[in-house]
Amino acid sequence: MRWLGLLFTFATLAAPAPARAQVAPHASWTVLPWTNGVASAAYDVNRRRLTSFREHVYQRKDAATATRELAYDAYFGLRSGGQNVWLTERAPESAGWDDRAGIARVVQRHGDLRATQYFFAPFATTAPVVVAVIEVTNVGATPAADAAVFWLANLRAGTGDGTIGERITWTSGAFEERGARGLLLHAPQPAPTHHAASPDNPYLLVNAGGHLVDSVDSGVRDDAVPGFEWDVSGLAPGASRRFAVVLGFDAGGDRAALDAAVAAAGTTPDELLSRARGDWAGFFARTRSPAGLSADEQQVYDRQLAVLRMAQIREPGRGHGAIMASLPPGMWNIAWVRDQAFATAALIEAGLTDEAKAGLAFWMGARVGDYVCCDRDGGPWVGAPYALSVVRYFGDGSEESDSDGRGPNVEFDGFGLALANVADYVDATGDTAFVTTHADALFTRTADVLVGLVEPGGPAAGLIRADSSIWESHWYDGGRQHWAFTQATSVLGLRATARLADRIGRGADASRYRAAADALTAAANAALITPGRLIRASLEQTSANLDAAAVGFLRWGLVPPDGDVAIGTLEAWRQGLAVPSGHGIHRNDDGGEYDRREWIAVDMWLADAWRAAGRADRADPLVAWVTAQARLNYDLIPENYHRDTGDYLGEVPMAGFGAGAYVSALWRRTAPPGPDGGLPVDAGLDAGAGGDDGGGGCCDAGGAPAPWPALVIAIALVPRRRRRLTRTSRDVRRG
């Protein structure tokens, strides 16, 4: 019956893709986020103000402790010719980034004064500190008359929503805002002409057209607000002056600690900005770029490296080195193993091996082990001591999963991805000491765990046990399945572990891991390639089984990347998962709103696969689309695009599933895949499931056949699909 499968593949390849009008790249995102790996903050271009300041990059320290939002808003104002305005009332002339740095830059104007503002978190400190610098330039023809710069910061140190029971005092040249949450420091540079705080509300004073009045103590009150004023009257035409405010937070109320953090960042506005720029220049000096990037691609590429840097925790402690899935205020500021793996792969490719090693060291030192045994039915989850979280981590480096009515997510795909990261890191650096230091975690508690997860018999014999995998389908009631993605990552990881074993002289282990990878490859091909020569989502899904995550089979060498299975599956996804916007695809055919968005990581993985299949004409438009969209949206890459409009959706910016996927796609365009990126033609394929038999199938056709007769025959001969298995991942996060 194999000829029926070949005929179906032939018909799929020959059928034209659905005609779709393509949405043009356009702007749809307005928030500029930044971090220093400790504090995070964001500026909303539409609202023309800082709208977020958080004490941590991560969402939760532990199950009981959420990261707090410390800001309502903050912004500058100007007085020109005796006329006051808060800059929230002036449209920006431009907004974006200060060259490649993680420094937001916004330009606005009032009268003859132009304000160039810079917002950033200094990497010179590991304290939660955010800096706002304003450079005021007189663009008029005469000296500035009756002119000033204002600043207001509405932060939250109290109880409840943070506004209850605050007290602001002028102490040692700065405002201290204290409450139940701790100390918020408002440190002006240089000393202001005036410093006001509630009840002398600076917002109302400026709106009334006057100047600020000096305040010393607000008393305990709700929603207290401080502000500053600097006089710039007499500023000559063409001249500029800079002013700055450093915002810092200490939960223990330690002013001395915050003073030290401010001093490390800089003691003048010029020093604050120059040190931050110098730090970012030093970072980019350690990076490398793939050859042949266009100017737009280089801009987007560099921004992704900045995002990856800012997504990594720099706080001391067990969480140090973890990489968030997104920057806050996006809600995926959580360290998923899978997302971190894609981010780490990109760091290694870009030459940022110090950051990559910090991420790997985090994995090796994290606290895990909550999901050895047993589930509600008495069966194992992992079934053995393991080294990596089954899903993600809290900010303190402890394991976290998420549960709903179908139980927890328990995912095995991260194990293989992490092993591949380690092997790639060692290939790039020669750091075999990392392998010997963490040999137990890498070999016994990860690679051997994968080998132990292989099903011994039954319909799934030879496959990795059912799990929740990439789309987080949960554990019970049909959620866990033998997903193609997990099989592919496990093959990748076992081959990578064989390389690691070879490097430290463990030849017998290397042979054992290679044999396990080969056996798993054969089993996966036998079980997960349909008679129609397509890779299906899982063993359990016998119909409606399109899942773009199965691209791992192509990217990691379970099937020849340019064989009939690869090309037929790519074409099936291209047609069956097309989005109305006319560019990429959605992630699977489950039908939920989240599923049916366009997934940027999927687009980039498909670009890799199409290129490896010899179809650069399919790969290049995907990269070009994401690049063009990013260029119009501050070079940031989101989790999703709206399936109809192409607008940004989901969390922005994404690290592993955004920045990491884009960086790797550009590297794979110009450099061959790594040691485990492909197999010889037909490797691991059995006669009934995988490789082309050379008998004149679709990939050997010499001409361009008429498509529709073949399609009609194929439809007539293929049996009616059985009713699909209901998936359980409709409303869960993509992983």
Describe each model-derived feature in a short phrase.
Residues 23-73, 343, 379, 386-414, ...:
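C-terminal capping/lid segments that line or modulate ligand- or cofactor-binding pockets
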Residues 23-110, 176-206, 231-233, 273-294, ...:
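An extended acidic
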Residues 23-25, 105-107, 113-212, 226-228, ...:
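Polysaccharide-binding surfaces and accessory modules of carbohydrate-active proteins
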Residues 95, 143-147, 233-254:
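Short Pro-Gly-centered flexible turn/kink motifs
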Residues 185-199, 300, 371-400, 409, ...:
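Extended ligand-binding clefts on enzyme/binding-domain cores
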Residues 706-723:
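A cross-kingdom C-terminal cell-surface attachment/processing module
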